[in-house]
């Protein structure tokens, strides 16, 4: 028996993503987005761009998807989730973020229908509309007080 991990299968892809967990008066900022599975709910989230820091990606994705400017203040968690077809594994860095402004009239990213504010219970009542299990998990971890300092993450240019 080999002590080495198996070779990764051909076609396996790792996607690094970020998500902003933004709470205001007991409601969380979410997006309704079009997916191949229909309209789904998600945090403002997306892929890390080449050369971009995780913190910059979090702020950028929130702005592009909701027109809200946000400032990450803590890491909520790091989540590994393999898509059901096994072709993609997502590693999501979820950040607690504060609102820092709103750009009225900003055109949202393609596929984003609108930004919505929902309570945890409202979100939990419609699991069939979640983009992934990470949507509620990140909010539950946030509500459980999980916060890690941002200096845990190092970005080198």
Can you say where each PLM-predicted feature lies in the sequence?
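Short, solvent-exposed loop/turn elements at beta->coil junctions and helix N-caps
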Residues: 8, 76-84
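Short connector loops at helix/strand junctions that flank enzyme active sites
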Residues: 15, 23, 43, 70, ...
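Hydrophobic/basic alpha-helical segments enriched in Actinobacteria
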Residues: 17, 23, 73-76, 120, ...
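Conserved beta-strand and immediately adjacent loop positions that scaffold enzyme active sites
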Residues: 19, 27, 114
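Conserved Nudix-box catalytic region and its N-terminal flanking loop in Nudix hydrolases
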Residues: 24-64
